[in-house]
Amino acid sequence: MEGSKRKHDSRRPQQEQEQPRPRTPPSYEEIAKYGHSFNVKRFTNEEMCLKNDYPRIISYNPPPK
């Protein structure tokens, strides 16, 4: 029982060390470049797809009615 408790205690300090770093908010230039894709940080592939698709979405102009 004591061994399992020690393992859990050893994992917690590592997680606590990573969290305290404050995240700097993205600048207006970065928001204009990447838009909502800045919130996607879990999967780098998904993030790159959103960054690559974003300029195409902006450049698309619907035909006037």
Curated annotation (Swiss-Prot):
Induction: Expressed in the early phase of the viral replicative cycle.
Ranges of Basic residues composition bias in the record: 1-10
UniProt-annotated stretches for the region Disordered: 1-29
Pfam families: Orthopox_F8 (PF05886)
Protein name, entry field: Protein OPG052
Lineage, highest ranks first: Viruses, Varidnaviria, Bamfordvirae, Nucleocytoviricota, Pokkesviricetes
ATP-binding recorded as keyword: no
InterPro entries from the UniProt entry: Poxvirus_F8
Keywords of this entry: Early protein
Domain of life from the UniProt record: Viruses
Family assignment from sequence similarity: Belongs to the orthopoxvirus OPG052 family.
Protein's organism: Vaccinia virus (strain Copenhagen) (VACV)
Record field: compositional bias (Basic and acidic residues): 11-21
